[in-house]
Amino acid sequence: MKKLDKTNNSNKLSYQKDGTPYCQRFDDIYFESESGYQQSDFVFIQKNKIGLRLQIAKQTFTVAETGFGTGLNFLLTLQAYQKAQQVSSFQLAPLHFISVEKYPLTKEQLVQSLSILPQLQSLALTFINSYPDCPVEEFGQEFKTTFFNGQVRLTLIFDDAAQGFSSLNCSKEGLVDAWYLDGFTPAKNPDMWSKDLFSQIGRLSKDQATLTTFTVAGFVKRQLRDIGFRLEKLLAKGKKKEMLSAVMQSNPITNKGYYLRPLITKPQHVSIIGGGIASACAAYALTKQGVKVTLYCKDTSLAQGGSSNAIGALYPLLHQQEDDISSFYQQAFWRAKALYTEIAEQGFSFAHQWCGLLEVSYKEALIKRQQAFESLNTWPNELIHGVNAKQASELANIDLPYGGLFMPNAGWMSPRDLVKQIFNAAKSTTRLKIMTDTHITKIQQVANPSSNENGTSWSLTSNQGEFNASVLVICGGADAIEIEQLKSLPLTATRGQVTSMKSNKKINKLSTVICHKGYLTPENNGIHCIGATFQKNDTNITTNKADDDYNLTMLTKCLPELSSTIDWQEQDISSSKARLRCMSQDHLPLVGAVPDIKEHVATYSHLAKDKNWKYSQAAPCIDNLYVLLGLGARGLCSAPLAADILTAELCNTPYPVDSQMLFNLSPNRFIIRDIIKRKIKS
């Protein structure tokens, strides 16, 4: 490996009275002793959403940095990975941290500089022990090491920033997920902030890559815009008052303008119509971003619709091979489990158990399906794996004659309690106002109010009077289908009835959720839940005996031995509940701005002749009207990730999913597909 070709690469440091490391070459400090940890954590870790993105990453997550300096940002990222792994029940995807440093510090300088950061001492010691123990002049061109049994890789390139990054290879999809533009300011270190550097940043960035930096210099902003970043200037912390946050909007998306979501100024206030799991997750995510929220719930109390069941199962919808549906639900599942764990750890308790879920292979078609899962091995074992009848019986703690597919990280919870506690967590921010017994029956657009910097607002008509919403999000489940502005969306209401059964000594030891054509949950408060029916074109939520009989019959038909052992009779029914699900055509939620159908047809009409026709025009949408709908029977799984996507759209923060998945969830996907299939004439 070649040596550094610079003749003066050593860095002379001095230390201020409080221990702050000071660089004589650039006449500036590396970080402040009192607030450096908090400042860097806020700008680079929090504003890039590193912790969340590490939890949901499917492939190696790559961070690139200009100016390694003392290694503070790397250690913060290492700490974020450690914390994310601690709250995760599965092995995180690997992390690769790449940093370019023209003037590296010696091991002795690192020891002294990092000694004033007690929050990072353990990780700092591990890092320093692996660092080159020789003069800077003898460093190679790069240094590599690993942490956490190889899960985290560090690549340090000792070179000029632009030159160092030019040595990296990447595919057309890009390499870097998040950028830390650190190093000293353009005024102090102008050579680093070159046009060549920004060209490399553009070349290496993935679609939706994020970037943060302390500098807000005009030159930097212009260069970032030129290479495709969307910018937002934010308040920083400590003595550094401002910062930049940016998201890459790359060329492949602009070839399909209908993939682009509308940009709005982050609203100070958002109104939500709902009361169940979707609105709870949306309210929580928005209030955590500093947005004030008013919730309008038609019922006298929360969680009275589809989220009102006593027990519900949380598990992903997976197919043998990875496809759009499976890809979304596996990511949504991990996000849901992380959020619900977070809520519980904050002290907002709800009945739940991570006991796993068993999909029983009770017939030949399901046996073949299980064999396909096992042979293809598409998914990691911690998500799903096959078990035989003996293993299934041990997992369930009851005798089962069949094997099946086991999801060890799945479980059950009380949706009703969970929803209320998520709302309580949102209320603890003091940014949530809840108005129950307020049924919004009509919404009407109000043009150009002076109070709304995003343009039009909405007038809401209810049984409690008129209200105004600057930005409106509709999460009202099946009720939303009746709102005039949403009738063009292909949503349907499907009735479902769940039956609660009294436990007995033959089934009370059940220790995992069982799925067949229906499902059977473990005992909670003396009951088990079985279900559920699926009835289209039926909006009557009055319970009936026929549906209870159906739920019991399905258990008997699919698992006759178990049903015979339990011996449930009609008198063992504790209660029943019927509610409506809001379903989409493709079994994926609808998240985002409501499309203007007429403008879509006018704008994208040539897709009917050439589906690959390139458009730069962003999707025309109805101003300030958003939905989080179509969660169907899987709201527990899909709501948290969908809420994160909605919040990213409203707050101009990085999306937690890629551009293709964004389109797969976009409310305009149906009209685009219909234009391509020539179902709609322009």
Swiss-Prot record:
One of its GO terms (molecular function) is oxidoreductase activity, acting on the CH-NH group of donors. InterPro entries: FAD-dep_OxRdtase, FAD/NAD-bd_sf, MnmC-like_methylTransf, SAM-dependent_MTases_sf, tRNA_MAMT_biosynth_bifunc_MnmC, tRNA_MNMC2, tRNA_S-uridine_synth_MnmC_C. Its cofactor is FAD. Keywords: Cytoplasm, FAD, Flavoprotein, Methyltransferase, Multifunctional enzyme, Oxidoreductase, S-adenosyl-L-methionine, Transferase, tRNA processing. Residues 273-682 are annotated as: FAD-dependent cmnm(5)s(2)U34 oxidoreductase. It catalyses: 5-aminomethyl-2-thiouridine(34) in tRNA + S-adenosyl-L-methionine = 5-methylaminomethyl-2-thiouridine(34) in tRNA + S-adenosyl-L-homocysteine + H(+). Residues 1-249 are annotated as: tRNA (mnm(5)s(2)U34)-methyltransferase. It is found in: Cytoplasm. Pfam families: DAO (PF01266), Methyltransf_30 (PF05430). One of its GO terms (cellular component) is cytoplasm. One of its GO terms (biological process) is methylation. It comes from the Bacteria. Its EC number is 2.1.1.61, 1.5.-.-. NCBIfam families: MnmC_Cterm, PRK01747.1-2, tRNA_MNMC2. HAMAP family: MnmC. In the N-terminal section; belongs to the methyltransferase superfamily. tRNA (mnm(5)s(2)U34)-methyltransferase family. In the C-terminal section; belongs to the DAO family. Catalyzes the last two steps in the biosynthesis of 5-methylaminomethyl-2-thiouridine (mnm(5)s(2)U) at the wobble position (U34) in tRNA. Catalyzes the FAD-dependent demodification of cmnm(5)s(2)U34 to nm(5)s(2)U34, followed by the transfer of a methyl group from S-adenosyl-L-methionine to nm(5)s(2)U34, to form mnm(5)s(2)U34. This is tRNA 5-methylaminomethyl-2-thiouridine biosynthesis bifunctional protein MnmC.
